[in-house]
Each structure stands twice: as C-alpha cells, then as structure tokens.
Amino acid sequence: MRMGLITPDPAHPLLAATAALLAGRHEVDVLHPAAGAAAAAGASADVYLLKARTPAALELARALERGGAPVVNSAAATERCQDRTGMAELALGAGLPFAATRTFASLALLASAADQEWPLVVKSRRSRKDDLVVRLDGPDGLRELAPRWGAEPVVTQAFAPNSGWDHKLWVVGDQVFAGLRRSELATGAAESPRGPERLPDGWAELALRVGRVFGLDVYGVDVIAEDGGGPLIVDVNAFPGIRGQAGAPEALAALALRRAAAARQGR
C-alpha cells in the first residue's frame, strides 16, 4: 500500500518511526504542505496522515479528500481544534467536562471588561504554534501583554485549582497513551515530564469520547484533575507529537494500514 505524510518535517520522531515501520512492505511519500492544493495533483496514496495545521496544509487535505482519498485527521476535524471558541461550544454541547470558556474579540476588550474574577487563564482564540497561553493573577498582567497581544482575539477560562500537572492523554485510533507534564501555568521550579501514567478510572473512555465528538483519529486531550479529583478538559489538539510514548508509532502505522485497506475495499 502507499502512504502519504503531509508534513514539513518528515524527520519528526513519531512520523519517522512510523515511516520506518511501514517502509519494508509499503511505499511512503511525503507531501510538503506549503504548495497547498497544487500538491494534490498526481498524488495517489491510499491514505494520508495530516501532521500540519497551516491554511495551506488544510487546503491540501481538502483537495485530497475531494479526490476520494482518506486523510487522518480530516481537514474538518483538524479545523475544529483550531478555534477554541468552537471547541468549547462543541465539547460542552456534547456534555464533556470542558472548562467554561468566554470569548473576546481582542485582548484589549478583555482588559476593559469589569466582571473578571482572578486568577484567569487567557489563550489565543486560534490554537497554533507560539500562541498565547498564560495565567494572569490580576489586571496588571493584561497591561503587560497589551503591547504584543492587544489586538489578539482571545478566550478566557477560570483558573481551576489543581496539582500543577497536566494530564496529557494521546489517542491513536482506539489506543490511549498518557503522561504527566508540568503545566505551563504552574508556579514554582520547572520539573521533568513524568510518564507513562496510570489513568484514573473512566479517563481513557473520556479521551475516546472526545474523539467521537470531534471526529478525530489521532489527537491529544489536555486534562487537569480538579481539587475534587474529577477531570476537567482544557484543550484538544489534532495530531500532536506524542513524543516518548512506547507503542505510539506502531499504533499509528496500524491505523494507517486499516484506513488504507478500507479505502481500497471501497473503490
């Protein structure tokens, strides 16, 4: 079978390991997403893995889908994870334990709102590399951010007291991987990542449910354990790096082969 990787970085550890597993019996092609839909011309893989989130990458994914090729994750599912306002609306509407989220057209408008309770988590509305994710303990923090981020559309979430560790849940197909990462919002000295982690009862099923709600096959779910012990989802990411998780490349290779085989049978 023939697999396609949509990525500017085929040497990424997850992709490189997956490609190595497939290369013995299958062809693996790399499509750089910079060319957008034009890169779909002549493309003939049985399945494509979308490890990019730029507008050009999504344009390429949509072009491949129009041609009948399966893309993991789909362009639509990937886009759902880029708008944090829509993400929260979808998750809360489906009954997922997602952090309550407010939207502001700009950080400057947030600064003018009089009804904020502190501390507050402020994030860029559009999820992307090097976006804004910060905990603020009062209005002074907003003023410090204004020169760089004043025009940035943002969302806010109330800061939920927690241990300072993010539970990272990664899903590939029906397999759930997990680890602990020191929260970027935590105070105090940085600590090394922990993992793998034994998840509390019900958390693995919660992660799989997120995939069904968002239409995702390869994704990450950021969860914090509230003081009462219950899970609170604070972010969902399409096709994260899943670094250092034993078995993740094998799970991704198996998923790609299943999707490719299903596509061939459907022709």
Where are these regions (language model features)?
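A long amphipathic alpha-helix within ATP-dependent nucleotide-binding catalytic cores
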Residues: A186-I233, N237, G247-G266
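A short linear hydrophobic-aromatic micro-motif
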Residues: A100, P119-V122, V154-Q157, V218-V221
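Hydrophobic alpha-helical segments and helix pairs
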Residues: C81-D130
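Short glycine-rich anion-binding loops that position phosphate/pyrophosphate groups of nucleotides
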Residues: R53-P55, R126-S127, F239
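Conserved N-proximal alpha/beta basic substrate-recognition cap immediately N-terminal to
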Residues: R2, T7-A100
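Short, well-ordered alpha-helical microsegments
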Residues: L14-L15, A56-E59, L110, L142, ...
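A short beta-strand motif that forms the metal-chelation/ATP-contact edge
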Residues: A45-L49, K123, L169-V171, G229-G244
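Phosphate-binding site of ATP-dependent enzymes
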Residues: D131-F214
